[in-house]
Regions:
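Active-site "cap" helix and flanking loop/linker of ATP-utilizing ligase/carboxylase catalytic domains
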Residues: 46-68, 74, 84-138
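Pre-DFG segment of protein kinase catalytic domains
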Residues: 80-82
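A broadly conserved detector of short glycine/acidic/proline-rich loop/turn motifs that flank catalytic sites
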Residues: 8, 19-20, 84-85, 136-138, ...
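A short, polar/proline- and glycine-enriched secondary-structure boundary/capping micro-motif
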Residues: 25-29, 90-94, 155
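Generic structural signal for well-ordered, non-membrane alpha-helical segments
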Residues: 41-48, 102, 185-188
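Peripheral (often C-terminal) accessory segments that flank ATP-dependent C-N-forming ligase machineries
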Residues: 110-194
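Internal nucleotide-binding/catalytic subdomain
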Residues: 1-78, 87
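Short, flexible turn/loop "capping" segments at secondary-structure junctions
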Residues: 28-29, 89, 168-173
Length: 194
């Protein structure tokens, strides 16, 4: 599963980032992490960047943020799950878009709300960014390993609830999270998938 993060101004849509979603799978499909950019082929990325703006236009979304969740079918076609006229949650809009693309999504949302054209100049070179949510002690062990082996990747660590105090049954019951960013996508992916 993926999502596409866009800013729109006066009916013009700008794709800022595409996000891969990691989940627990059936039965709850709780998101365990996200990564930007995803490992999609150039053809698949182009399909996303072409299809999602058309969907936003069809829904008459003209100004502000959007978070479009989708899957790719076996032929690589975009299949929309839902479109929210908002930034992505779980630190996607607030942190990952900026880290991965250099675009200040929060600022853009404010600018468009004020009727101003958003600033579309990236503040830095693109990177790979990811967030890992804490479900078990294993997630904390991975965090400690990152601190000792690759501390430069660690961008943020949330406050943590004591792990194991309750069962994680939805996004609101996760124990915390940490955010990573760096130039090497394979390295970020490895830390997210351990």
């Amino acid at each position: 599963e993926y999502s596409c993060e866009c800013i729109s101004y006066q009916g013009r849509h700008h794709v800022l980032a595409v996000t891969k979603k990691y989940t627990t799978g059936y039965p709850h499909f709780i998101e365990t992490g996200h990564m930007e950019p995803p490992e999609l082929s150039e053809i698949e990325m182009n399909r996303v960047k072409e299809f999602i703006p058309k969907a936003l236009t069809a829904l008459e979304i003209e100004n502000g943020a959007s978070h479009s969740e989708f899957k790719l079918d076996a032929d690589g076609n975009v299949r929309i799950i839902e479109i929210g006229s908002r930034m992505g949650g779980d630190c996607i809009g607030s942190h990952l878009v900026y880290l991965s693309s250099g675009y200040d999504f929060v600022r853009m949302v404010i600018e468009t709300a004020l009727g101003q054209e958003p600033e579309l100049t990236p503040a830095h070179e693109p990177m790979c960014a990811g967030i890992r949510f804490v479900f078990t002690k294993k997630d904390l062990d991975v965090l400690e390993e990152i601190k000792s082996k690759s501390p430069e990747l660690l961008q943020m660590v949330s406050e943590m609830e004591p792990v194991g105090e309750h069962q994680v049954v939805d996004s609101g019951s996760r124990f915390g999270y940490y955010i990573l960013a760096g130039k090497n996508q394979a390295e970020i992916k490895d830390w997210l998938e351990r």
